[in-house]
């Protein structure tokens, strides 16, 4: 069996609770082959691992959310097909998002992120969103914010995906998008384990952030909610550590029947002399 662990901002780059849990889990299954799909901010972390990888880790794939699409910058621009444009518009307006069409667009076609983000189709879809929800804002600011929001998601859409029997995402967010896309492409199973609730953590960060103001905070938060809802919908099983976290997952769109609460284990024998 081949298992792909999909992790954002932790293993194998950073030491921490989630990273240690992943490392221990891999070592507990020495006869299972693991592949790591690790998401980092940029290439400064390339190959800089905080852990010595176990022998049953066969490959590590790295995705950088702040990567730049220079290699295809000067390709001839092409308009999207009607189905592709409808899917793009559904994503931006968050109206019955056609994720699988978008996965196929970026995985099966030689598209340039620059051409998508700077093209007429993206402009038209953003304009529709602006007119429906945000016409009180300055349009140029809104447009560039939307480009900033969708660049890391579109980079994620283009990621080369290792084939595996099971994709285990240790958060929703971009990891959940990758797992959902891999499920669509390979027909594999998807498992999501949340130690913290990704959407709530990003929401708290954005509320405190100085780099984004006013209603733009809400637009970013909605983007993370959208991605998390995808992961919940596509997963076969979603785990959380306690009941309150389970309730948050339900509020964020996870079907209750998919959720299992798996509290952190305690070695009782270590406490018997207390």
Question: How would you label these PLM feature ranges?
Answer:
Residues 153-163, 197-198, 215-238:
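Membrane-proximal helix-turn-helix segments that form the acceptor-binding/catalytic region
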Residues 250, 256-257, 266-274:
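Acidic anion/phosphate-binding donor-loop and adjacent secondary structure
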Residues 244, 265:
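Carbohydrate-associated surface elements
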Residues 101, 158-176, 185-191, 195:
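Short N-terminal targeting/anchoring amphipathic segment
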Residues 141-166, 176-178, 226:
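An amphipathic, basic-hydrophobic alpha-helix
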Residues 8, 39, 194-197, 263-264:
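Histidine-centered beta-alpha loop that forms part of the nucleotide-sugar donor binding/catalytic region
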Residues 3, 166, 183-210, 214, ...:
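Active-site proximal beta-strand in glycosyltransferases
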Residues 1-126, 130:
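N-terminal subdomain of nucleotide-sugar transferases
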């Amino acid at each position: 069996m081949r298992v792909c662990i999909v992790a954002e901002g932790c293993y194998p780059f950073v030491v921490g609770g989630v990273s240690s849990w992943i490392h221990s889990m891999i070592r507990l299954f020495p006869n299972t082959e693991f592949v790591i799909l690790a998401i980092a901010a940029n290439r400064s972390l390339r190959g800089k691992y905080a852990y010595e990888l176990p022998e049953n880790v066969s490959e590590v794939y790295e995705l950088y959310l702040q990567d730049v699409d220079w290699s295809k910058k000067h390709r001839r621009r092409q308009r999207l097909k009607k189905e592709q444009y409808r899917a793009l518009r559904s994503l931006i307006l968050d109206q019955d998002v056609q994720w699988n069409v978008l996965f196929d667009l970026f995985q099966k076609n030689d598209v340039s992120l620059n051409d998508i983000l700077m093209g007429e189709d993206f402009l038209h879809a953003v304009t529709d969103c602006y007119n429906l929800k945000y016409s009180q804002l300055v349009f140029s600011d809104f447009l560039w914010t939307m480009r900033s929001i969708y660049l890391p998601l579109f980079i994620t859409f283009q990621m080369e995906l290792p084939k595996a029997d099971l994709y285990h995402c240790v958060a929703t967010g971009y990891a959940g998008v990758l797992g959902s896309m891999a499920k669509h492409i390979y027909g594999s199973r998807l498992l999501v384990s949340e130690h913290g609730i990704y959407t709530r953590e990003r929401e708290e960060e954005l509320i405190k952030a100085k780099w984004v103001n006013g209603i733009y905070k809400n637009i970013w938060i909605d983007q993370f909610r959208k991605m998390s809802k995808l992961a919940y919908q596509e997963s076969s099983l979603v785990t959380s550590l306690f009941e309150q976290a389970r309730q948050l997952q339900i509020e964020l769109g996870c079907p209750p029947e998919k959720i299992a609460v798996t509290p952190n284990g305690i070695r009782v024998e270590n406490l018997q002399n207390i």
